[in-house]
Amino acid sequence: RPFDWPAQGRVSGVFGSQRILNGQPRQPHYGLDVAGPVGTPILAAQSGRVVLAAEFHFFGRLLVLDHGHRVHTLYAHLSEIESREGQEVRQGARIARMGATGRVTGPHLHFSLGLGPLWLDPRPLLPG
């Protein structure tokens, strides 16, 4: 089945939008942002294996799932990570909680879809 929405909330950022920082154009936005309250459940958009659960300056708390065939999803700015590296997760399983960690202006989930080294717009694969 296609991917599920990883969180409930309002879409606050779309794939490919141009980012401006200190008046300077930056790289395009390589994900979909879903805004909501801190603690909102984050669900696995598709079944897979947790290959990274860590914290970074920009992305804050971050999870990456490997879905096979070089497809992976990235979940960033999490308040809590509820999965561990190496764990197999089913589509729709709670894997984390929405937060405002890393470089953000408010609580949201940054959700990215990768195919090998390429970032793709996840929206066409999500319901509705």
Feature map (PLM): residue ranges:
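Catalytic cores of peptidoglycan-degrading enzymes
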Residues: 4-128
